[in-house]
Amino acid sequence: FDTFGIDLTHWKWLIELCFLVVLVSINLIAVKVFGEVEFWFSMIKITLICAMIATAVVMIVIGYHYPAVQIHGVDHVSPAGHAGFDNLFANFSFAPNGWMAFLMSFQMVFFAYEMIEFVGVTVSETKNPRKVLPKAINEIIVRVLIFYVGALMAIMCIVPWTSFKPNKDGSFASPFIMVFQYAGLNWASALVFFVVITAASSALNSLLYSAGRHLYQLAGESPNPTLNKIGQVSDRK
Protein backbone atom coordinates (compact mmCIF):
# COMPACT_ATOMS: atom_id res chain seq x y z
CA PHE A 1 0.00 0.00 0.00
CA ASP A 2 2.92 2.32 0.67
CA THR A 3 3.85 2.00 -3.02
CA PHE A 4 0.59 3.70 -3.99
CA GLY A 5 0.67 6.31 -1.23
CA ILE A 6 -2.05 4.66 0.86
CA ASP A 7 -1.45 5.00 4.60
CA LEU A 8 -2.94 2.07 6.50
CA THR A 9 -0.73 2.33 9.56
CA HIS A 10 -3.64 2.40 11.98
CA TRP A 11 -5.49 -0.44 10.23
CA LYS A 12 -2.71 -2.98 9.75
CA TRP A 13 -3.79 -5.02 12.76
CA LEU A 14 -7.33 -5.32 11.39
CA ILE A 15 -6.14 -6.35 7.92
CA GLU A 16 -3.80 -8.94 9.43
CA LEU A 17 -6.57 -10.26 11.67
CA CYS A 18 -8.97 -10.60 8.73
CA PHE A 19 -6.41 -12.52 6.68
CA LEU A 20 -5.64 -14.78 9.63
CA VAL A 21 -9.33 -15.53 10.30
CA VAL A 22 -9.97 -16.38 6.64
CA LEU A 23 -6.93 -18.64 6.33
CA VAL A 24 -7.57 -20.40 9.64
CA SER A 25 -11.15 -21.03 8.52
CA ILE A 26 -9.88 -22.54 5.26
CA ASN A 27 -7.65 -24.93 7.19
CA LEU A 28 -10.44 -25.89 9.61
CA ILE A 29 -13.04 -26.76 6.95
CA ALA A 30 -11.33 -29.63 5.13
CA VAL A 31 -7.99 -30.49 3.57
CA LYS A 32 -9.52 -30.50 0.07
CA VAL A 33 -10.48 -26.83 0.57
CA PHE A 34 -6.89 -26.07 1.54
CA GLY A 35 -5.66 -27.87 -1.57
CA GLU A 36 -8.09 -26.01 -3.83
CA VAL A 37 -7.10 -22.63 -2.41
CA GLU A 38 -3.39 -23.41 -2.75
CA PHE A 39 -3.95 -24.49 -6.35
CA TRP A 40 -5.45 -21.13 -7.28
CA PHE A 41 -2.83 -19.21 -5.29
CA SER A 42 -0.13 -21.06 -7.26
CA MET A 43 -1.88 -20.47 -10.57
CA ILE A 44 -1.96 -16.72 -9.90
CA LYS A 45 1.79 -16.64 -9.22
CA ILE A 46 2.63 -18.83 -12.21
CA THR A 47 0.44 -16.74 -14.51
CA LEU A 48 2.25 -13.54 -13.50
CA ILE A 49 5.69 -15.07 -14.03
CA CYS A 50 4.70 -16.49 -17.43
CA ALA A 51 3.20 -13.13 -18.43
CA MET A 52 6.39 -11.34 -17.44
CA ILE A 53 8.59 -13.82 -19.34
CA ALA A 54 6.33 -13.55 -22.41
CA THR A 55 6.46 -9.75 -22.24
CA ALA A 56 10.26 -9.85 -22.02
CA VAL A 57 10.52 -12.24 -24.98
CA VAL A 58 8.37 -9.96 -27.15
CA MET A 59 10.44 -6.92 -26.15
CA ILE A 60 13.68 -8.75 -27.00
CA VAL A 61 12.42 -10.04 -30.36
CA ILE A 62 11.30 -6.61 -31.57
CA GLY A 63 14.38 -4.89 -30.14
CA TYR A 64 12.28 -2.65 -27.93
CA HIS A 65 13.78 0.65 -26.75
CA TYR A 66 12.23 2.28 -23.70
CA PRO A 67 12.55 5.86 -22.43
CA ALA A 68 13.47 6.95 -18.91
CA VAL A 69 10.58 5.98 -16.63
CA GLN A 70 9.46 6.91 -13.13
CA ILE A 71 8.90 3.45 -11.67
CA HIS A 72 6.29 2.95 -8.94
CA GLY A 73 8.07 2.66 -5.60
CA VAL A 74 11.26 4.40 -6.80
CA ASP A 75 12.28 7.89 -5.69
CA HIS A 76 14.42 8.47 -8.78
CA VAL A 77 13.90 8.16 -12.54
CA SER A 78 15.11 4.87 -14.02
CA PRO A 79 17.34 5.37 -17.07
CA ALA A 80 16.34 4.67 -20.67
CA GLY A 81 17.56 1.52 -22.33
CA HIS A 82 16.73 -1.36 -24.62
CA ALA A 83 15.75 -5.02 -24.42
CA GLY A 84 18.37 -7.53 -25.52
CA PHE A 85 20.57 -10.42 -24.48
CA ASP A 86 23.56 -8.09 -24.38
CA ASN A 87 22.17 -6.68 -21.12
CA LEU A 88 23.08 -10.00 -19.48
CA PHE A 89 26.80 -9.46 -20.09
CA ALA A 90 27.15 -5.67 -20.28
CA ASN A 91 29.47 -4.38 -17.52
CA PHE A 92 29.67 -7.94 -16.21
CA SER A 93 31.20 -8.41 -12.78
CA PHE A 94 30.89 -11.51 -10.62
CA ALA A 95 30.66 -9.64 -7.32
CA PRO A 96 30.29 -5.92 -8.17
CA ASN A 97 29.32 -4.96 -4.61
CA GLY A 98 31.96 -7.06 -2.87
CA TRP A 99 32.09 -10.63 -1.60
CA MET A 100 30.20 -9.82 1.58
CA ALA A 101 27.19 -8.64 -0.44
CA PHE A 102 27.49 -11.80 -2.55
CA LEU A 103 27.41 -13.99 0.56
CA MET A 104 24.54 -12.02 2.08
CA SER A 105 22.48 -12.69 -1.05
CA PHE A 106 22.38 -16.37 -0.14
CA GLN A 107 19.87 -15.71 2.62
CA MET A 108 17.39 -14.61 -0.07
CA VAL A 109 18.15 -17.74 -2.10
CA PHE A 110 17.68 -20.00 0.92
CA PHE A 111 14.46 -18.19 1.77
CA ALA A 112 13.05 -19.20 -1.62
CA TYR A 113 13.57 -22.88 -0.75
CA GLU A 114 12.10 -22.84 2.74
CA MET A 115 9.28 -25.24 3.63
CA ILE A 116 10.71 -28.08 1.52
CA GLU A 117 9.78 -30.29 4.49
CA PHE A 118 6.18 -29.50 3.60
CA VAL A 119 6.39 -32.38 1.10
CA GLY A 120 6.80 -34.84 3.96
CA VAL A 121 3.88 -33.37 5.90
CA THR A 122 1.49 -33.94 2.99
CA VAL A 123 2.42 -37.60 2.45
CA SER A 124 -0.25 -38.96 4.78
CA GLU A 125 -3.01 -37.08 2.95
CA THR A 126 -1.95 -37.88 -0.60
CA LYS A 127 -4.04 -40.43 -2.49
CA ASN A 128 -1.14 -42.13 -4.26
CA PRO A 129 2.08 -40.92 -2.61
CA ARG A 130 4.32 -43.55 -4.25
CA LYS A 131 3.41 -42.16 -7.66
CA VAL A 132 2.64 -38.50 -6.98
CA LEU A 133 5.53 -37.47 -4.70
CA PRO A 134 8.44 -38.79 -6.84
CA LYS A 135 6.92 -37.06 -9.86
CA ALA A 136 6.50 -33.78 -7.96
CA ILE A 137 10.05 -33.90 -6.57
CA ASN A 138 11.60 -34.78 -9.95
CA GLU A 139 9.82 -31.83 -11.56
CA ILE A 140 11.35 -29.35 -9.09
CA ILE A 141 14.46 -28.80 -11.24
CA VAL A 142 12.30 -28.00 -14.28
CA ARG A 143 10.20 -25.54 -12.30
CA VAL A 144 13.30 -23.87 -10.86
CA LEU A 145 14.79 -23.47 -14.35
CA ILE A 146 11.60 -21.94 -15.75
CA PHE A 147 10.16 -19.88 -12.92
CA TYR A 148 13.38 -18.90 -11.11
CA VAL A 149 16.29 -18.91 -13.56
CA GLY A 150 14.05 -18.11 -16.53
CA ALA A 151 12.40 -15.20 -14.75
CA LEU A 152 15.78 -13.79 -13.66
CA MET A 153 17.16 -13.99 -17.20
CA ALA A 154 14.03 -12.32 -18.60
CA ILE A 155 14.34 -9.48 -16.09
CA MET A 156 18.06 -8.96 -16.72
CA CYS A 157 17.53 -8.90 -20.50
CA ILE A 158 15.21 -5.93 -20.02
CA VAL A 159 16.73 -4.21 -17.00
CA PRO A 160 20.55 -4.19 -16.73
CA TRP A 161 21.78 -4.92 -13.23
CA THR A 162 23.35 -1.45 -13.15
CA SER A 163 19.83 0.05 -13.30
CA PHE A 164 18.88 -1.43 -9.92
CA LYS A 165 19.63 1.40 -7.53
CA PRO A 166 18.26 1.63 -3.98
CA ASN A 167 15.94 4.33 -2.73
CA LYS A 168 17.03 6.68 0.03
CA ASP A 169 15.60 4.27 2.61
CA GLY A 170 17.56 1.35 1.13
CA SER A 171 14.56 -0.35 -0.51
CA PHE A 172 14.34 -1.44 -4.15
CA ALA A 173 11.51 -1.44 -6.67
CA SER A 174 9.98 -4.71 -7.79
CA PRO A 175 11.80 -5.93 -10.93
CA PHE A 176 8.47 -7.30 -12.19
CA ILE A 177 6.95 -3.82 -11.99
CA MET A 178 10.00 -2.38 -13.77
CA VAL A 179 9.64 -4.81 -16.70
CA PHE A 180 5.93 -4.11 -17.13
CA GLN A 181 6.36 -0.33 -16.84
CA TYR A 182 9.23 -0.32 -19.32
CA ALA A 183 6.83 -2.13 -21.66
CA GLY A 184 4.30 0.68 -21.15
CA LEU A 185 1.95 -1.39 -18.97
CA ASN A 186 1.67 1.03 -16.05
CA TRP A 187 -1.48 -0.66 -14.73
CA ALA A 188 0.49 -3.87 -14.16
CA SER A 189 1.96 -2.50 -10.92
CA ALA A 190 -1.43 -2.99 -9.25
CA LEU A 191 -1.54 -6.54 -10.63
CA VAL A 192 1.90 -7.31 -9.21
CA PHE A 193 0.80 -5.94 -5.85
CA PHE A 194 -2.22 -8.27 -5.91
CA VAL A 195 -0.01 -11.25 -6.71
CA VAL A 196 2.34 -10.36 -3.84
CA ILE A 197 -0.66 -10.41 -1.49
CA THR A 198 -1.74 -13.84 -2.77
CA ALA A 199 1.84 -15.15 -2.47
CA ALA A 200 2.05 -13.99 1.15
CA SER A 201 -1.38 -15.52 1.82
CA SER A 202 -0.23 -18.79 0.26
CA ALA A 203 2.85 -18.89 2.49
CA LEU A 204 0.78 -18.22 5.62
CA ASN A 205 -1.81 -20.77 4.54
CA SER A 206 0.87 -23.45 4.14
CA LEU A 207 2.41 -22.58 7.51
CA LEU A 208 -0.97 -22.93 9.21
CA TYR A 209 -1.49 -26.30 7.52
CA SER A 210 1.93 -27.55 8.61
CA ALA A 211 1.51 -26.23 12.17
CA GLY A 212 -1.92 -27.84 12.46
CA ARG A 213 -0.62 -31.24 11.35
CA HIS A 214 2.28 -31.09 13.80
CA LEU A 215 -0.03 -30.14 16.68
CA TYR A 216 -2.36 -33.00 15.71
CA GLN A 217 0.56 -35.43 15.80
CA LEU A 218 1.74 -34.16 19.20
CA ALA A 219 -1.79 -34.31 20.65
CA GLY A 220 -2.28 -37.87 19.42
CA GLU A 221 0.98 -39.08 20.97
CA SER A 222 0.52 -37.24 24.26
CA PRO A 223 -0.24 -39.29 27.42
CA ASN A 224 -2.51 -36.46 28.59
CA PRO A 225 -6.21 -37.32 27.90
CA THR A 226 -7.08 -33.63 27.55
CA LEU A 227 -4.57 -33.19 24.75
CA ASN A 228 -5.85 -36.38 23.12
CA LYS A 229 -9.31 -34.81 22.89
CA ILE A 230 -7.84 -31.70 21.28
CA GLY A 231 -6.38 -33.99 18.62
CA GLN A 232 -9.78 -35.35 17.58
CA VAL A 233 -10.85 -34.37 14.06
CA SER A 234 -13.97 -34.71 11.93
CA ASP A 235 -14.47 -37.14 9.05
CA ARG A 236 -14.29 -34.36 6.44
CA LYS A 237 -11.51 -34.83 3.91
Language-model features: locations:
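Helix-loop-helix connectors at the membrane interface of multi-pass transporters/channels
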Residues: 1-14, 48, 122-129, 135-143, ...
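TM-loop-TM module centered on a large, flexible mid-protein loop between adjacent transmembrane helices
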Residues: 1-3, 79, 89-92, 136-205, ...
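Extracellular/lumenal inter-transmembrane loop segments of multi-pass membrane transporters
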Residues: 1-11, 26, 31, 61-92, ...
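Membrane-interfacial loop-to-helix junctions in multi-pass transporters
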Residues: 8-14, 94-99, 182-191
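Membrane-interface loop-to-helix entry segments
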Residues: 13-79, 110-114, 137-141, 145
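Hydrophobic alpha-helical transmembrane segments of multi-pass membrane proteins
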Residues: 18-25, 103-110, 191-205
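Juxtamembrane transmembrane-helix termini
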Residues: 29-36, 55-65, 124-127, 154-161, ...
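Internal metal/ion-chelating core segments
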Residues: 83-163
